[in-house]
Amino acid sequence: PLSSTLAVSYYKYYIMDTVDVAGDKCVDLAFVPVNSQSYGFTGRLYITLDGNYAVKKFLLNTPANINLNWVDKLRIEQEFKRMPDSTWVLANENTYVNFYIVKGAQQLYAHQLRNFDKYQFDVQNADSIFGLLGPIHELPEATAQTDTFWIHNRHVPLKEKESALDDLLAQLRKVPAFNVIIKTAEILITGYIPTTADKDKSKFDFGPMNTTFSANHLEGFRMRVGGMTTANLNPHWFGSGYLAYGVNDRKLKYNAKLTYSVNKKKYHEGESPVNNISAIQEYDVYTPGQDFLFTSKDNMFVAWKVGEPVTMMQYIRKTMLQYQKEWLNGLTLTTWARNENNEAAGTLRYDRYDADGTLTNLKSFTNTELGTQLRFAPGERAYNGREGKNSLFNLSKDAPVFKLSHQMGLKNVLGSDFNYNHTEISAEKRIWLSSFGHIDALVTAGKVWDKVPFPLLIMPNPNQSITIQPQAFNMMRALEFVSDQYVSFYFTYYMK
């Protein structure tokens, strides 16, 4: 409603009255979208009449005919106050939502009240947190406070019904049907099952559950079981991994990871800000070039392939040391040292072209590499999901993301067969188009600077699963294209 370019084309405005809002004389300005089914709002703007024409307060409601997934009604209220230096800041925010799971069934109601106070703009000698560029970051101990602390520090005391909410939730969890729904939702979102009835006391979680059963051409039916320790066992040391077995190849695969977190964690190792040292040992089956960003390769829905069967595969045995450091200004540094043995499997062959023109079949090759990646996302909000910032459930994607990485192969180090240098750079941004939706744009480029065998060249990420995966080519087969340099563009338009 305040857009300087599209507002008057998208909304109709009506002056309703002149009112007093918390001591400020304001004009009550009503607005409605020209099209009642469009993604816009109806509501009121309260504009001060002191010559500054500042927004003192606004009310936003979704139109009656809007199609907004499971949301039936949404109302947002914000009120602002003027500071002594004439800066306007947010004072109160109320959000009301009516939503449903099944159309026509009993609706659910949610209300959130947020109050802001004690703004400080002239902090002297800012410490290492407030002196950085990042926005709001929640430290693990921020929510681990006693009831007494909140009684003395809340700007607005809780009402009696609000204070009883925790007791109500505890009673609801005793209802079997409700508890089953909550547990199922937690498993679907996190992918893990706690080993205690109270998740906050679990020392080990089983998962991810969507990787328990899968299948591929080489292994046939594949079974996998794994999990991870939590901060309830130790807030600095974390272990995770899995065991997997294929019915056809009858080989046991495994992954074991031990992580030391310099920062004390609330529940799992991936909580922001990350400052972790990890050691990884792994032996497993991979498809060349396939690297899904938002899920595991063993996800049962990703493992279900369509089209031409994927028969070219690899057994990879890997030992890796990794250090990852995340600063609150959006900069992340990742460095690693890796030794990897790559064995051809299925219909994949490694043939060496000798000087006399003959081909020699190689069962496997070994490479040792050092690598580093810089990731910079200025203004990015912290996300504490187990899968990290690339998680599908991380909806905070407005900040631009820039990445620069380089990998260097070291011949004759720990049996390595090749020298190589591989550089990649990328830029990603969500572009908002006002009422016309948004575009997720990603541009990447990479180059291998040395002469290397094809498994060490650049392979576009193919996707032959039944699901559409971001940043993957859905019409491409594994190893269909291999190159030593590339530029790729990914643009996804979400229309409204």
Task: Place the predicted regions along the sequence by residue.
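Short, charged, low-hydrophobicity "junction" segments
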Residues: 2, 30-32, 65, 463-469
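Exposed, low-structure sequence patches enriched in small/polar residues
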Residues: 133-496
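Gly/Pro-enriched, hydrophobic low-complexity segments
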Residues: 13-15, 20, 24-131
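Active-site acidic/histidine clusters and adjacent loop/turn architecture
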Residues: 1-10
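Intrinsically disordered, low-complexity boundary segments flanking structured domains
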Residues: 2, 15-18, 78-80, 263-267, ...
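Generic preference for hydrophobic/aromatic residues in regular secondary structure cores
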Residues: 11-17, 76, 90, 114-116, ...
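Hydrophobic transmembrane signal anchors and adjacent membrane-proximal interface regions, especially
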Residues: 8, 53, 149-151
